Amino acid sequence: MSTNSSGSPVLSLLIPIYNVERYLHECLDSAVAQTLKDIEIICINDGSTDSSPDIIREYMERDARVKMIDKANSGYGDSMNRGLEMAYGKYVGILESDDFMAPDALEKLVAAAERNGADFTKANFDLYWSKPEERRELMELFKAKDCGKPVHPSDTVDAFSLKPSIWSAVYRRDFLNRNAIRFLPTPGAAFQDASFTFKVFALADTAVFLHDSVLSYRQDNEGSSVNSPNKVHCVNDEYAEIHRWIVEDCAESHSSQDVAKLLRFANVIKYDSYMWSYIRLNPKYYAEFLNRMAQEFRGALEAHEFELTDLKPWKRANLKAIVDDPQKWLAESSGFASAGAMGRAKHYARVGGPGVVVAFVLNAIKK
């Protein structure tokens, strides 16, 4: 398939790489085997100290489409921005170096974008484990009934609430460039896809979602905590950038109603992101993180950027308890991070009462 007559490739595939020799062959094998042949594969080596650069060079020798940006370590956001500056395909795709794509992934994503004139297309993916035995589980972000048709993604908060998964999508490069959509280049940071994803969903005129699973998202190392002090507040930095972008940049080009809507959406999804980040933290950082979370949401509520009623009942009760007294919440919720569904239900009963638990259970059943 080739849709670009300008001499540039149909798609630029960006692969950020740092010390991932164990998985890199499988990743690059899936990239060069794509049924969409008219692509460039840009490997951004972020100062790897293992054999990753040598593996990239192996593929460069075998396939002229493979290129490398070889640079000192500067973090994920800066690596991605360097790749975006080098890319010259009509579309941009992203592949994490420990994941791998289905052979027809890029062809399906680009074809859907072309048919619908979409600024981006996004698909489902598989959670993948290689040990103790190989298994996969579909991460169904999109139900079949919602797929294959153009949508305006900023119409509903549900779209913003999806897992960012920037790598199960392709984006029109001119859309990203025209809107100056880039990654937050904080050195050593984690969770650097939140602000990128928010801007994409807020600014896209048209998107298309696909039910197909296009990628295997490796889970073998998912159990690791955030143990580095300089990574504790990375998610806060992402949402600070989202807030800055809305109140400064969007205020110049959007109506006051749209700005208010985006602020509300940002705070609703921020709650989910913060709780997910909290669960992954080393426990010694819980108190510090909760104090900042409470301060931020208290400020947002006082500024009328959103209301607690914008959240589902169990989330509303939980956030109110954190905002009211984060240290009391921590003292009474020591097992929250590791709790299963029953443990969470008991927690929500304590902070919100039986009605909140009923809503939580019904939501779980509906899923």
Regions found by a protein language model. Give the residues of each.
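Membrane-interface aromatic/basic loop that binds lipid-linked glycans or pyrophosphate carriers
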Residues: 3, 118, 279-367
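Donor-binding/catalytic cores of nucleotide-activated saccharide
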Residues: 76, 80, 97-211, 215-233
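Short alpha-helix within the catalytic core of nucleotide-sugar-dependent glycosyltransferases
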Residues: 25-29, 53-57, 89, 102-114
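N-proximal low-complexity "stem/linker" segments adjacent to membrane-targeting elements
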Residues: 1-32
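Catalytic core of nucleotide-sugar-dependent glycosyltransferases
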Residues: 212-221, 227-254, 271-303
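Short aromatic/hydrophobic "clamp" motif used to bind/position activated sugar donors
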Residues: 92
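Cell-envelope/extracellular polymer assembly enzymes that use nucleotide-activated donors
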Residues: 9-12, 40, 195
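A conserved acidic beta->alpha catalytic loop
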Residues: 45-54, 74
